[in-house]
Amino acid sequence: MLRSCTAGLRSIWALRGRREGAPRLSMDLQPARRLFSTEKVIHKDWALPNPSWSKDLKLLFDQFMKKCEDGSWERLPSYKRRSTQESEDFKTYFLDPKLVEEERLSQAQLFTRGFEDGLGFEYVIFKNNDEKRTVCLFQGGPYLQGVPGLLHGGAMATMIDIALGSCTGGAVMTANLNINFKRPVPLCSVVVINSQLDKLEGRKLFLSCNVRSVDEKTLYSEATGLFIKLDPEKSST
C-alpha cells in the first residue's frame, strides 16, 4: 500500500516538474532516504506516549513509571518488528522452511503495531517479575470499532492474548484462550488488563486476567489461557 502510494506521488511530482520547469530530485538519493525512514520506524519503541493518548492513559502511564523507579516493576518496550536475531532463531527452530516465503516474511510487522498513532492499538505493558503478573494499559482507536461506538470483541481478544503472553517471560504460543465478555468496551476508552501466572506444569503455563475500567468499577471481561513454552528440541521442523 505504502509503495503504491509512494509510486503514485512520484509520478505526480515528475509530471509537475516537467510542466512547471521545476528541478527533479535525483532518483539515486531516494532509496537511501526511504531506507533510513523505514529503519527509524522499525526501531522506534511504540510503548511510549504519543499525542493520541488520552489523559487517562497518560496518567496511568506516569503512575506505573513511578512504580518502576524502585525496580519492582518494569516497562516492556514494543517494536513493529522482532530483532533480526529473534526472527532467525524462530525460523531455524520452529518454522517449516517449506511454508516460509522469505520475501513476505521480511516485510512482516507486529499486527497490533501496524496502525498510525491513535487509530488502532495504543498500549503499554508493565511487568512485576516477583509477583509474576503484568498490567496492560490499553486504548482502542476508531479503526477497532465493532458495533457502532463500541470496541470490536476480536480487538479485545487480541489484547487479552498479548497481555497474558507477556506474563510468560519466554517464547510461547497460545494453546487455549477462554474469554467471558461481561460488558462492551466503549470505543477510544482506556481499560486496564491485569494478568497473572497461576500455575506452571512443565512447558504448560496457565494464566488468567481481567479487564476493567480505569476507576476499576466496571468489569468488561475475564479470561483464562493456556500457553506452551516452545522447545527447540521439539520443534515442528
Curated annotation (Swiss-Prot):
Keyword Ubl conjugation: no
Residue(s) carrying Phosphoserine: 37
Transit peptide is among the record's keywords: yes
Organism encoding this protein: Bos taurus (Bovine)
Organelle transit peptide residues: 1-36
Function in brief: Has acyl-CoA thioesterase activity towards medium and long-chain (C14 to C18) fatty acyl-CoA substrates, and probably plays a role in mitochondrial fatty acid metabolism. Plays a role in the apoptotic process, possibly via its regulation of AKT1 activity.
Post-translational modification as stated in the protein's UniProt record: Phosphorylated.
Species classification: Eukaryota, Metazoa, Chordata, Craniata, Vertebrata
Name of the protein described by the UniProt record: Acyl-coenzyme A thioesterase THEM4
Recorded family membership: Belongs to the THEM4/THEM5 thioesterase family.
Name of the top EC class for this enzyme: hydrolase
